[in-house]
Amino acid sequence: VATVDCSEYPKPACTLEYMPLCGSDNQTYSNKCNFCNAVVDSNGTLTLSHFGKC
């Protein structure tokens, strides 16, 4: 199972680097920062499905 450490999040701003991750909500997040901010917003219900686009 793929995991991402989101302990340093949320962050107020994310970089524009493109390293897509696919969330359990079937949405593609452009990078770890955007994904982790969404995880925090979801109170931990959002998880990583896999690396790369959904």
Swiss-Prot record:
Subcellular localization, as worded in the UniProt entry: Secreted
Site (Reactive bond 3) residue list: L16, E17
Disulfide bond residue pairs: C6-C36, C14-C33, C22-C54
Record-linked Gene3D superfamilies: 3.30.60.30
Domain (Kazal-like) ranges: 4-54
MF term (GO), any: serine-type endopeptidase inhibitor activity
Residues of this chain annotated as glycosylated in UniProt: N43
One GO location term (cellular component): extracellular region
Keyword Glycoprotein: yes
PROSITE patterns with a match to the protein in the record: KAZAL_1, KAZAL_2
Keywords recorded for this protein, A-Z: Disulfide bond, Glycoprotein, Protease inhibitor, Repeat, Secreted, Serine protease inhibitor
Main location: secreted
Domain remark text: Avian ovomucoid consists of three homologous, tandem Kazal family inhibitory domains.
Protein name from the UniProt record: Ovomucoid
Lineage: Eukaryota, Metazoa, Chordata, Craniata, Vertebrata
